[in-house]
């Protein structure tokens, strides 16, 4: 069996990624492709925790005039919808999967319990962490950093629609320069938008590297866990 570099990872997938080419909702072609990739990686013996966003269903910044806490709670519920879609796709492929939510909703998912999550991972189950941190004013990127620290993940795999971190938006600027490696302070000081400052600081404090890579290219998740040099790595300087 091919060797992997990372044995326990947190994979962060944005809600927008699940929308595919749509502006809204879930593209099940994308969900099924992601599930295929996760199965391949899980079959290599990698323990996978998933954190999913909700921006394909609800974006708090569009909630003009709405109470921020209420808007954030709606966003948390959106992540649960996405988590259930991913769980279903994975289970159809024979991958045992558990959804754990930061807000209790026992009829459809387990509550987040750290020791139980780790036990699931050790048994080869994929664990999807939904509902963010369970608190308003915190992003799902921060949830990914928090869960990675709690379950002792070796790396956060930050799945994007671009193949790494650039000095400016490569979709808008043809002369954008890609970074191969960055420090946490580079990300914070240059405002590169890899993750928000809270999420980045949490990774820095706990020395959790972040690998930013292109999710739209099939096979990239496997390449990253096997140590292939793709994307941008953010780590201690």
Swiss-Prot record:
GO terms for cellular component: cytoplasm. It comes from Caldanaerobacter subterraneus subsp. tengcongensis (strain DSM 15242 / JCM 11007 / NBRC 100824 / MB4) (Thermoanaerobacter tengcongensis). The keyword Transmembrane does not apply. Inhibited by UTP. InterPro entries: AceGlu_kinase-like_sf (IPR036393), Asp/Glu/Uridylate_kinase (IPR001048), Uridylate_kinase (IPR011817), Uridylate_kinase_bac (IPR015963). Its EC number is 2.7.4.22. Catalyzes the reversible phosphorylation of UMP to UDP. Its main location: cytoplasm. GO terms for biological process: 'de novo' CTP biosynthetic process; UDP biosynthetic process. It is found in: Cytoplasm. SUPFAM superfamilies: Carbamate kinase-like (SSF53633). Pathway: Pyrimidine metabolism; CTP biosynthesis via de novo pathway; UDP from UMP (UMPK route): step 1/1. This is Uridylate kinase. The lineage of its organism: Bacteria, Bacillati, Bacillota, Clostridia, Thermoanaerobacterales.
């Amino acid at each position: 069996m091919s060797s992997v570099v990372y044995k326990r990872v947190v994979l962060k997938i944005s809600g927008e990624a699940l929308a595919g080419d749509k502006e809204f909702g879930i593209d099940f072609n994308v969900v099924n492709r992601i599930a295929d990739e996760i199965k391949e990686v899980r079959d290599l013996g990698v323990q996978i925790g998933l954190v999913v966003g909700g921006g394909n269903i609800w974006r708090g910044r569009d909630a003009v005039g709405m109470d921020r806490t209420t808007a954030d709670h709606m966003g948390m519920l959106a992540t649960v919808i996405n988590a259930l879609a991913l769980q279903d796709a994975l289970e159809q492929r024979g991958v045992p999967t558990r959804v754990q939510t930061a807000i209790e909703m026992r009829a459809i998912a387990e509550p987040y319990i750290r020791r139980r999550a780790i036990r699931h991972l050790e048994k080869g189950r994929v664990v999807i962490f939904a509902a963010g941190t369970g608190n308003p004013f915190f992003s799902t990127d921060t949830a990914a950093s928090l869960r990675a620290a709690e379950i002792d993940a070796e790396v956060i795999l930050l799945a994007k629609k671009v193949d790494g971190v650039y000095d400016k938006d490569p979709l808008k600027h043809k002369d954008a320069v890609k970074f191969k490696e960055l420090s946490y302070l580079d990300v914070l000081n240059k405002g590169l938008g890899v993750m928000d400052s809270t999420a980045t600081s949490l990774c820095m404090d706990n020395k959790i590297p972040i690998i930013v890579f292109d999710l739209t290219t099939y096979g990239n998740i496997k390449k990253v866990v096997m140590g292939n040099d793709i994307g941008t790595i953010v780590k201690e300087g």
